């Protein structure tokens, strides 16, 4: 319907600040001394294929189930295809993105009847699948980030703080990341999770 299509488009637009900053931040984490454009291009090289795989596999699953159920493909996959890359780390293998996307769309949505009938968010189902099936890629004490140095990784702010308690945790956190870095998103993490500001902008747009 027109209302569903409009709603899905609005949600995709709301995600653009997070995805665009996430692309830039991946390049920034690799080399903060480069220009904004160079960092964005570097991040796009990493994130672009993840988005393409997510949309391709998710769209294929949607088409197959639409054929089986003999109805049109709805616009729900536009949101799912963007959400899945947002919750994934930038170094996740592309084949893993494909498997997680298929699992998330089929188990998280299609078995319940498709968009509007699912009780779980397909993107979070995909993330949970990767978390339990391939924990080394998405969990542990370190979150991987793209780097010129193979194997370079860094602790996330939450893990840094959780290693201590009370004011000691805050002091340790301040020593690693500034509050402005954490608010604007100049920290390592999953593609769309780092920038509080970008998430707020998207949320305000939806209001």
Which residue ranges define each predicted feature?
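N-terminal signal-anchor module of multipass membrane proteins
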Residues: 1-55, 59
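Short, amphipathic, aromatic/basic-enriched membrane-interface segments that mark the entry/exit
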Residues: 2-4, 45-46, 63-73, 89-92, ...
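Alpha-helical transmembrane segments in multi-pass membrane proteins
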Residues: 10-18, 49-62, 77-81, 85, ...
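Structural signature of hydrophobic alpha-helical transmembrane segments
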Residues: 40-56, 91-100, 187-196
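C-terminal ends of transmembrane helices
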Residues: 58-70, 106-116, 201-207
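Membrane-interface helix-loop-helix junctions at boundaries between adjacent transmembrane segments
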Residues: 72-151
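Hydrophobic alpha-helical bundle architecture
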Residues: 86-89, 190, 202-207
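Long hydrophobic alpha-helical segments that form multi-pass transmembrane helix bundles
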Residues: 116-200
